[in-house]
From Swiss-Prot:
Signal peptide: none annotated. Residues 102-111 have a biased composition (Polar residues). PROSITE patterns: TBC_RABGAP. It comes from Homo sapiens. This is Putative TBC1 domain family member 29. Disulfide bonds: none annotated. Residues 1-43 form the Rab-GAP TBC domain.
Amino acid sequence: MGHLDKEGLCTQGSSFSWLLRVLNDGISLGLTPCLWDMYLLEGEQMLMLITSIAFKVQRSLYEETNKETWGPATPRALKGTGRARPICESLHSSLQALTASESSRGPSLLQTPPRVPGQQALSRGDKGISVSLSLPSLPSRRGRCGRIIG
């Protein structure tokens, strides 16, 4: 079941499936590869930004469709193609701002931790680290005569 978001657009349950549908159906061919490149290069942290851009493009296409109903028609083949370059430039500047803010936070958790002195790094051939635990031995249950009880 759909609901209205803060932009006033109807959204379905799965935002990723919605994003795929919008990228395939409603956005120009010039913008779609640019958005997918950003997603593939930057991963999940860019998904919200890409979704926001897709919402804006869908909203402008919706408004354009309403203008066609009430005003002069525009060719459907050109719909959405004029906005591809400014949106990509906006995405690029947003990516630069995101990268700058990430670098100001310090090292990422995904980076390799600093090497401890005296510890060797694992090579590709290592199959894992074997850890041997020495457990304390349980006292034997012997009676006074040396016989095992139990």
